[in-house]
Amino acid sequence: MAAEEEDEVEWVVESIAGFLRGPDWSIPILDFVEQKCEVFDDEEESKLTYTEIHQEYKELVEKLLESYLKEIGINEDQFQEACTSPLAKTRTSQAILQPVLAAEDFTIFKAMMVQKNIEMQLQAIRIIQERNGVLPDCLTDGADVVSDLEQEEMKILREVLRKSKEEYDQEEERKRKKQSSEGKMEEPPIYTSETAKLTNSQGDGEHFVQPSSEVKVHFTNQSVQPLARKMELLPETSSLTQKGLKIPGLEHASMEGPIANLSALGTEELRQREHYLKQKRDKLMSMRKDMRAKQIQNTEQKGKPTREAEEMTEKPEMTAEEKQTLLKRRLLAEKLKEEVINK
């Protein structure tokens, strides 16, 4: 009994593998994946569009599998048992069953679609290169231009920061010197005012009030002078902002010119790339559709004589055991044929 069950599971696995290799499965699945993979990118965030496409894919897989299993006489329990058997755990079987597993696992589905999107882009670029000999400027020069501009921008920013730090340090040094000199000059009036208060309390106020006022006026004039100097220095320190970060002695140290056009240039290059690749990708997909349509037509034409012969030599209906035996023979013949061809 155990041997019979193992044989049955092996037969189910082999029949499903044969179906997944055939055109009835691979052509509609590949058409769907190639048409829908364009929106998939390698980001952690999953968009709502991804979920909708996954649901469409799941419905397509269920429809194809259901029609095949019904035709061959395999029920759902046998199918589940075959998918969980050790025969289905091998590397070859897992690669064949990946499109089926992707219908149930969104992570596998997304990885499959991202990989197909990258493959389609690389194929489009390869076709362009084979036809023209070289790639167009929009697919080669854009990255170099952006990197050069970024390097130039970093040089300018470093120079600006260095110059600004030097000017800031110089300004702070001037302030410290002025504060120390002002502190030294302010010490006598404090002493004089205290003396004036003491003498004023003793009754000689009129004699000392006049000197204190003179001292006050004198230091008021002194305090106006450093303020005027600070006002004169303001245009020098603010000139970087007013002149677009132009530093004296550095002709190239400016944020204008190519850096100002960085964002516009990058956007235009990316737009050209996207448009160019989309055109070639559409051509590639149309070529593949034509090839698959011819393949389906050829398989149908090859199948017609055998169907007519079967109808002409109609035999009584076979039993389930005879069907299984016949299917095993066919699968064995196909397997031997593949091994001979591969050798």
UniProtKB/Swiss-Prot annotation:
> Could you say which protein family the record assigns here?
Belongs to the CFAP36 family.
Its domain of life reads Eukaryota
Q: Which UniProt keywords apply?
A: Cell projection, Cilium, Coiled coil, Cytoplasm, Flagellum, Nucleus, Phosphoprotein
Is Cytoplasm a UniProt keyword of this protein?
yes
Q: What is this protein called?
A: Cilia- and flagella-associated protein 36
Question: Gene3D superfamilies from the xrefs?
Answer: ADP-ribosylation factor-like 2-binding protein, domain
Q: In which tissues is it expressed?
A: Widely expressed (at protein level).
Its chief place of residence is nucleus
What the entry lists under Pfam families is as follows: ARL2_Bind_BART
Q: Which residues lie in coiled coils?
A: 147-181
Q: Quote the cellular component terms of the Gene Ontology held in the record.
A: axoneme; ciliary base; ciliary transition zone; motile cilium; nucleus
- Which ranges does the record mark as transmembrane? none
Q: Mark out the compositionally biased spans (Basic and acidic residues).
A: 301-323
Q: How does it assemble?
A: Interacts with ARL3.
Span list, region Disordered:
165-191, 286-323
Q: Modified residue Phosphoserine is at which positions?
A: S85, S147, S201
Species this chain originates from: Rattus norvegicus (Rat)
Q: Does the keyword Protease apply?
A: no
Reported function = May act as an effector for ARL3.
Show the InterPro entries listed in the entry.
BART_dom, BART_sf, CFAP36
